[in-house]
Every structure is written in C-alpha cells, then in structure tokens.
Amino acid sequence: MAKRIIYNEQARRALERGIDILAESVAVTLGPKGRNVVLEKKFGAPQIINDGVTIAKEIELEDHIENTGVALIRQAASKTNDAAGDGTTTATVLAHAMVKAGLRNVAAGANAITLKKGIDKATDFLVKKIQEQAKPISDSNAIAQCGTIAAGNDEEVGQMIADAMDKVGKEGVISLEEGKSMETELEVTEGMRFDKGYISPYFATDTERMEAVLDEPYILLTDKKIGLVQDLVPVLEQIAKTGKPLLIVAEDIEKEALATLVVNRLRGVLNVAAVKAPGFGDRRKAMLEDMAVLTNGQLITEDAGLKLENATLDMLGTSRRVTINKDTTTIVAEGNEAAVQARCEQIKKQMDETDSTYDKEKLQERLAKLAGGVAVVKVGAATETEMKDKKLRLEDAINATKAAVEEGIVPGGGTTLAHLASEVHSWAASSLSGEELIGANIVEAALTAPLMRIAENAGANGAVIAEHVKSKPLNDGYNAASGEYVDMLSAGIVDPAKVTRSGLQNASSIAGMVLTTECIVADLPEKKDVASGGAGGGMGGDFDY
C-alpha cells in the first residue's frame, strides 16, 4: 500500500492535533465534578462512563497521522492502567501539557534530544520525591478514603472495598460480578487466584477487556501435558451435551490439542478456556490438589491410576465463576467449606513438621491462597448502562486501594504534583543548564495541569487556584467538591503514590518520544470508489431486493 511521509514541524503538529482531541475528551472526566462521556456502540445501548482509559481505547480518527498521536497518548493511559490500575486521566493530562510546552520549544529551535534528557532527569527527581512524601496506609479508614476518591467520590464504594480488604486481607482477591438487585453487595466465598493466564488469547469471551469469564463451569485438573486431542474427546463430548463451559488446568497443552480447542471455542461448539497449572514439580501437583479440593473435583493423574481418556463428569470440579486474563486466573467456588477447612489443617501440619524455611514459605503461600477466600462485590444498578459505569468505577477503586497498600498515599486532587513544581524548579536551577534546564521547566509547568483541570471542571479558575495552592503548606490543596482550600490528608482526599508516580513516568516517556519525532510514515487514505457505491438503475438505494 502507498505511504504518506511527513517531516519536521508538520509531522509534530499532526501528532499534536490527535493528542489534543484525545486529551480533551478524556480530561472532561477529571475530578469530583468531572463529566461523563457517552460511547456509541455498534450493538446494544450506548455506554456512559467516567473512566479515562476506556474512553481513550474508543477513539479512532479518520486521519492516519492524527490517529498516530491518539495512539501514542493512549499508550500513556494504558501503561498507567497496567501498572497502577488508576490515574489514567491524570497521565493523559500530564502528557498533553508536556507535549504542548515541548513542541513550542522545539519550534523555537531547541534541540529535542537535549530537552528529552532534561525531562527524564526531572522525572527521576520527582519520582524520588513522591516516594519520600508517601505515607504508609495504617488503617481501613485510609483504605476507604482511597477507594472513595478513585470511585469518583462514592463513599459507599470506598467503605465496601475497605470491608472486603478487612475480610480477605490486603493481598486477598476481590472479584466483581454483576448483581441481580439495585443494591451493591459484598459476599466472601471460597476461591483462589493464581498467576497463570489463558494459553491463547482466542479463549477471551470479552474482547474489549481481553478476559475470559466462565459462569458455572466444569473444571478439568490434570498434571500431564495434553498432546493429543483424542485424549480429551470423550470428556469434551460429555460436556458439550450439558451446554456448560469448561476450564482446563494442565501442565501444558500442545499445538494440535490447543488448535482444536480454539476452533471449537470460536465456532461456538464449546465454551472452553485452558490455562497452565501454576508452580513446578511437586509444588505444581500440590497446588492442583488444592484446586481439586476447592472445586470438589479430582486431580486426574497417572499416579492415582486415572487417565484423561477415561475421565467422567463426576471427576471434574465445578465453581460459581472463573475469570481469566492474560496473567491471572480467579476461581470463585462455593459450598465446599468443610473440605477446604480440612485441607488447610493438613497444610498447617506440614508447616509444623518441616524444617526448611523455603518449604514453610511455599506452604504458607498455599495456605493463604486456599484459606483467604475471595471477596465478591455484586454490582447493583437500575440499568445496564449504569451498571457498566459503576463496574468500571469499582475496578478503579479496587486497583487504587491495592496500589495504596503497596506504596502508600500522598495528598490527592493534583496537590502533590503542584507542590513539587517549586521543588523541581529550585533543583533544576542548581543542577541543570541550557536546554536540559528548559526540559525540566517543561515538566515543572505540566505539574500544575491536573490541578488546573480539576478546578476548571468544577467551574473555577484553574490558573488562580494552582498558584494559590503552590503558596500553601505541603498537604494543603483545593477541594473541588466543596470549593475550599483544606488539608487534603485530614479531609481524606488522597491518591496512591504508585498511581501518581506511574502517571508521571508514563506521561514523560510519551512526551519525550513525541518531541524527538522528525518523520512520520503512514498509510495514504483510501480513495472511495464513487461508481460502485450507487444502486442499480431505477432502484432506490435503501431497500434489500
């Protein structure tokens, strides 16, 4: 296909136009008074949401060059979402501010490579400062505050996540389900999560989120490699008759068998997903046995004289729900408490008997996975559209609280970044010179952008508020919900340090890449063939004949 090649300032300006479009559509959602965005869907009802990364994923422009700018800034949001699970809108606003200021300097003749060095050095300095200022989370009240802010100031959601963390522990699994009522409810049930995702992305049932969700599936557990599909055929035929989904957990599934499963899945013959068993050697077998106890099934192993080709439905485990993404598998089981309790006691005895610290550690991990259970939040709402929005907010809140437990919290509402602007200014003035200093100043100017946008979305003058906040003590900031200046930590307006740090790092990275762009190669737009578009002679174009 023919390509279009654009150089220099023209290339950077085309990227900037795409970045402007994406940043503006995402930035309207920032802060407690941020607005919603409606996404038109080809099938089904439109989606009304407040989640930065979901909006970013939806935007595709007609102009290929501008679309490249959209894709770049979308990456800043996606990477922040992958690392911290929240803060995607902040990352987008920061990246946009850095790109705008940087392009002005490049147009004025500054060296883009040296500017990028300055941006990178300033970012490294700020990351250290954010980590220094982070306060560890000490109680469930702070967890609730974090969840509340991430869920768009929904206190009920924040409190529910704090309760869930109390019940399953800070490392515990919190899963989301669509509820059947108007109320959002919390339930703790047996279950486990392990660090293995689907073997093939073709198993995903939700292609937007790249997740496989199986409701009330059968679970086939085996410690052998599945090489031939013939081994699976008898059990697959039995399951196909029931119409239920199937999860296969095996040491590995080789190409031929995997291809057959994928083809059956895509044709709709059988809703199946396959994951590799976690762990290695004896530990793998022990973990598979734990899963068998949890799901009320049997581990099909030749050590016990069981073969795959002879497997029957009563050997398979069952669960309420299984959610699989590219990295993890979460099994939500129920009604098997006594067996799980007995298995936990057995693991505790093994821990008492072993002298090896390593073995103790691994047994402790197994015990935590089995005994911890899964907190299931059943999302309730009046309509499907509201439920989808609520689910995304809850997901942000869960991710934010986990990030806060990991790296601590900092004052929220854009306050931390705004206060750090003066620190980076004095550090850069003494440590950098020339165009590197200009690069650091670009970062400094961008640091107030999230606070300004939060204030503007609340109907206030962003520039005035940003200057006012910078002159106040470190923890003081602007509460956009009430329009007052408050101590952010006391008011419970906090952000996880990890979210703030990830957003800044990803924004700087993308800004540096855009500034150092000198040429873009993109597809030429396809010419639409006018002649072939018309209807046959004398026939109206609106009817099927």
Swiss-Prot record:
One of the record's GO cellular component terms: cytoplasm
Superkingdom: Bacteria
Catalytic activity annotation: ATP + H2O + a folded polypeptide = ADP + phosphate + an unfolded polypeptide
Localisation per UniProt entry: Cytoplasm
Gene3D superfamilies named in the record: GroEL (3.50.7.10), GroEL-like equatorial domain (1.10.560.10), TCP-1-like chaperonin intermediate domain (3.30.260.10)
Ligand binding (ATP): T29, L30, G31, P32, D86, G87, T88, T89, T90, G413, N479, A480, A481, D495
EC number: 5.6.1.7
Pfam families xref list: Cpn60_TCP1 (PF00118)
Record-level GO BP terms: protein refolding
Keywords: ATP-binding, Chaperone, Cytoplasm, Isomerase, Nucleotide-binding
InterPro entries: Chaperonin_Cpn60_CS, Cpn60/GroEL, Cpn60/GroEL/TCP-1, GroEL-like_apical_dom_sf, GROEL-like_equatorial_sf, TCP-1-like_intermed_sf
Primary localization: cytoplasm
GO molecular function: ATP binding; ATP-dependent protein folding chaperone; isomerase activity; unfolded protein binding
Record family assignment: Belongs to the chaperonin (HSP60) family.
Function description: Together with its co-chaperonin GroES, plays an essential role in assisting protein folding. The GroEL-GroES system forms a nano-cage that allows encapsulation of the non-native substrate proteins and provides a physical environment optimized to promote and accelerate protein folding.
PANTHER family linked to this entry: 60 KDA HEAT SHOCK PROTEIN, MITOCHONDRIAL
Quaternary structure and interacting proteins, as annotated: Forms a cylinder of 14 subunits composed of two heptameric rings stacked back-to-back. Interacts with the co-chaperonin GroES.
Name of this protein: Chaperonin GroEL 2
Species name: Prochlorococcus marinus (strain SARG / CCMP1375 / SS120)
